[in-house]
Every structure is written in structure tokens, then in C-alpha cells.
Amino acid sequence: MNHDPAETRDTAAAPLADTESPSPVSPELTPHPAPAAQDIDTATAELTVDEDDEARLPEIEDDSAEVADGPLAVGRAAIEQAVRLAPTSPGVYRMLNAAHDVLYVGKAKNVKKRLSSYARPTGHVMRIARMIAATVTVEIISTSTETEALLLEANLIKQLRPRFNVLLRDDKSFPYILITGDHWAPQILKHRGAQSRPGRYFGPFASVGAVNRTITALQRAFLVRSCTDSFFESRTRPCLLYQIRRCSGPCTGEVDFPGYTELVREAKDFLSGRSRAVKQELAVEMEKASNELEFETAALYRDRLAALSAIQSQQGINPRTVEEADVFAIYQEGGYSCVEVFFFRTGQNWGNRAYFPRAEKSFTPEEVLASFLAQFYDDKPPPKLILLSHDIEDCALLADALCIKADRKVEISTPKRGEKKELVAHALTNAREALGRKLADTATQTRLLQGLATTLGLPKPPQRIEVYDNSHIQGTNAVGAMIVAGPDGFIKNQYRKFNIRSEGLTPGDDYAMMREVLERRFKRLAAAKAEGEAAKPNDDETPQWPDLVIIDGGRGQLNAARGVLTELGLDAEVTLLGVAKGPDRDAGRETLFMPEREAIKLEPRDPVLYFIQRLRDEAHRFVIGSHRKLRKKDIREAGLQEIPGIGPSRKRALLHHFGTLKEIERASLGDLGKVPGISAESARRIFDFFHPGPG
């Protein structure tokens, strides 16, 4: 939300289509198109990295530098020109520089009055003065109400990411638990995106990991299936999940329709907040079975009760008087801000997440929080209650905007006493601790980058490191990968994979694969640089041009990489480093290679060597994961016969023994050898297929 800059306040907030016309345009307040829904089978889903790991501290610009009078006068003149044409009604304005980049998006109840405040010759903080000095054009969009202006502002800020606004970063849709309603035997699964599939949705959860853990525990407690409908319909006998008591087996009639319906009802009741009643029901059934000497049945109820207790122990605090709320607390230190968000639904804690919005130092906690909230709910349904650690300006206006989006009442408050105040205080403690950890991690990373620069003789610590690796099995499903690291650690939204396209490659020709990957990466980057685009940072302030490129390999791989850069005329602009594994692939005995320099050997306990190992291992993890996805696709299309020596009879034996392809992949070498008809050699072949070594 926007505040008068004369009072040294700025803002952010709202939705809708952009327009290039500076003339007043009344936007249609239509909701964002919902992202494609993603239903994920928990029996086959891979556990992902916690979303919070991707949250990085933004770069904070120095806002104390003086601004020259000349540029200020030019900027004020451009704004004065816009004031003459500006309406006195509500609307949104955008300030643009000479390159037509949007510097700032703001909203106002009276656009003419707001813009006039920028045209004053004095009284601006340095942040506002720098923005005015860079402004050459102002564009205005009129709206019917101030509420519409707030919504539009938030949407445009998220879409355009202006330099002088508070920016919500690392924003993703949150996962939900879905119990489907379009099949006689409902399925429990993880879901993101539009809630268009029939069924009951429970959430949001703060992370995919929290959803995975909850679904696993719910399967143990309520034995609800997680398999896809097609897998369900094809079963002739129960799968492994039935054998390990994580499914009741409705596919093959191990449980009848009324019995399964009761299990689903109990699961829904538990997720709806009636956990005490569900646990009492299970306890009664357990005691009844025990009294009737049905000890195996009693043990099953005991295990189900234990699974429910495990879920509740993971949830931490569960409020007594708050049924549905999001709790926001902001903490600032060292010019950085951390907003901690807790999600409470049906009286249960569905987790929390830390955000590190980009905001210049002069923004107050109230200003950052107000702008953060408008952007946060731009594409998410708000709960009935929103609790805040700080009072924000235009709180009633934001509540009205969220009421319009939700089509029901939404209350925003800053509690002063009671349990709600305790929830906010708990969130504030988490915000302070999260920012403290992030600042400490950043300081450690800075020291490591400085040490790396000293070891390699670099002129300054690298701001962007790219690490490359490739993976294949005898040349099949060959894939290359790039991971990126910088002052804040791994930058996962910058990772890239490269499916090898070259035909006629000799199986196992790692040099040729690396050449293709680097050619594709640096041809694109060189073209962007020639057009003046590569020097621009992306939305996360990460430079696009690498200071250091690390290749997983020795002198040969290094020379192949150098050859590519030489052909592109970039060899003088990119520093290359090859990392060769030690004898017997021992960690700590690596050798480092750089062009036209002697090999470098570091002490096994050198922190710089450990840092390089972490970079290489992360590239290896990512490329192996990409390779496995390609292999799984082939397996889905061709079946287990894709594995050399595995025909239809052995495929049937494996599926009969393990139940699912996922369980075959998870099986140890010893477990594979126990399958009738699978020899030790075949077991080794199957195991190696699912667990390949590096490139």
C-alpha cells in the first residue's frame, strides 16, 4: 500500500493487467488465472527441498548517497507534466526511467494530490530523491475505487518488480492435502494450484515436506489409499502399502465399502479439527478389541492412535481459541527484514515459513508489512482472520480488498492481549531467529568466498559461481546440469538441466557432453551480453554472468571447457576450475586444476576445499536427480524391460514381490536378490540401473 512520500513513506500492493498507455484506463477487476493444478501421488512423489531453503537475503542498496540537483530538477519536471493531466480520483501510477524500466508503482485515493507531493523541491528522503531523479515518464491508470487501486497496485508490483518498491520474493503457491470426491474409494494426495478437482482440501501447509510427513502419518492412522485411479483399477492383489499397514486395500476388497467410507470420514474429521473425538473413537475400539481378546485388531488401533499423536507432536502449538488465521510478524536488523508467517486451520498449526522481502533500509516495519501483505494475498485466498505484529496504515482498506477477493468477511487485527497476542509473539520470536540464522549463514558464506578468491588468485570474491556436471548410463538418457551459488548460498531457482541433443556421440564421451552443455549455455549468454542484457541482474539480484565456472573433472574436462569458451571468444572473461576426485574417489583428496597453472592440492580439512566439495556434490545431486527423471519416463513408456536382461516374466516377479515400481527402485541389493527368479547378477543390474554412479 502507498503512503505519502512527504512523510517518508512508500508502498506496494495489487492486481491486474498492465497497460502501456499513460491515459486513464479503468481495469477490470478479474482474478488471476489460476495455475494448473498439480495432483501428486505420494507413493511416487520425491521429497523436495524445503521451500525455506531457497529464501535468500536481498541486496540492500545504500540509500544515504546525495542526489545531484540537475537530475532532481529533470525528474520533478517530468512529474509536474504528469500532474497537469492526472485525475483527482483513485488510481495507480507508475514511474519509469529513460530505458522504460518501471522504477515504482504506487496507488492513491487522489492521484493528482499524490503526484504533486513528489514535485516538491525539498523534503524527500534519499530513497525518494533517487527515484525522482531517475524518473522521465509517469503513467496513470484510473480505478473506480481506492480498493481497486490497492488490488491493482499489488498485482503490478509482483508482475513488474519495480526497484523502489518493497518486493515479496520466493513466492510460491502453497501445497494442500486433497481427499478426492470423484471416486467411490477416495484418494489422499498432495495438491498445488487451482482447486478444481472434486473433494475436500485441507491447508495451506507451509512446505511440501510438512504435507509429505502429514500424509504418511494419515495413511498409517486411517489407511486411506494414495495410489492413482488407474493404478487402483489395475490391481488384482494388494500392493506393498497394504502389507506395511499404510492402506486398507479397497482395490481388491480387503476392506468393504462401508468400512472404507468410515476410514475416510475419520480422516476428514481429524483434518477438520475434530481430532479429540476421532482419538476417543479409536481408543474405544482398541479397548473393545482387547476385551474380546482380538489382540491383533487392538494392536492395529494402537498403531493408528500413535500415528495421530505423531502428527500433533509435529504441529507444535495448536491454539484453543483461533480456528482459522494467518499470523504475520516482522523483524528488522542490519537493514534486512524477515516476515514470519504461521498458518492455522481448523484449530491446527499447518506450519510456518520465513520470507525476506526486498526493501531499502529507510522502510519501517509497518511499511514493509503492509506492502508484503497486499502482494502475499494477490494470488492466495485469505483466511477469516489475519493477525499482525505491527499496526499498518490503511488496514481497513486492505481488509475491504481481501473481502472482495474472498467474497466474505476478512478481519485484520494487531492483538494486544490473550492467546492471539501469544501467537503473534511466537511468530515474532521465529522471525528474529530466522533472520539471525540467515545473517550468520551469509557471513559464513562471505568468508568462504573470500577464502576461495585467495586460494584461486581471483581479483575479488565471486558473486556467481556456476558448477557443471553430467550423468548417463552407457550414453543413454544423457543429461547435463548447472547449479548456481553466490553470497547467500545455493540459488536454486537458477539451476538448469540440459538434455543432451547431439547425435552420434560415443557412449560415455563425457568431454563431448560437457562441450554441448557449455556451448548452449554460453552462446545464449554471449548473445544476451551483446545486446546489453546479460549485465542486468534478474529478479533476485543475481548477476547473470559467472565469475567462476567449476567443472566436475580433471585436466581433460577443463581443457574441453576451455576450448568451448575460446571458440566463443570468452576465455578471457570466465575463470575456469576443474575438480578431480582423489584416489578411490576419496573426499578430501581432490586436485584442483586451472588453465596454465600447476595443480592445486589443499589440506583435507581446509574450509575452502570443503566448500568446493559442497558445490560439486550439489551439482552431482541435481544432475543425478535430472537423470533419474528421464529414466523414469523411459520406464513408464517401456516398462522394466528397459533394464538389460529383464523380460516379461522377471518384470511380473518383481512387481508381484514389491507391488509398485517405486518400491523396486527403493529396494536394496539384498532385497532384489530375494525375488524368485532374480539372480545375483540380475539384482545387481537392476540396482545399478536405479542407482547409477556419476557421468
Curated annotation (Swiss-Prot):
Chain's gene name: uvrC
Functional description taken from the UniProt entry: The UvrABC repair system catalyzes the recognition and processing of DNA lesions. UvrC both incises the 5' and 3' sides of the lesion. The N-terminal half is responsible for the 3' incision and the C-terminal half is responsible for the 5' incision.
Residue ranges of domain UVR in the record: 276-311
Basic and acidic residues bias spans: 1-10
Keyword DNA damage in record: yes
Family: Belongs to the UvrC family.
GO BP terms: nucleotide-excision repair; SOS response
Domain of life: Bacteria
Gene Ontology CC entries for this record: cytoplasm; excinuclease repair complex
Main location: cytoplasm
Keywords: Cytoplasm, DNA damage, DNA excision, DNA repair, Excision nuclease, SOS response
SUPFAM superfamilies: C-terminal UvrC-binding domain of UvrB, GIY-YIG endonuclease, RuvA domain 2-like
Chain spans, region Disordered: 1-44
Subcellular location: Cytoplasm
Protein name (Swiss-Prot/TrEMBL): UvrABC system protein C
Pfam family, one: UvrC_RNaseH_dom
GO molecular function: DNA binding; excinuclease ABC activity
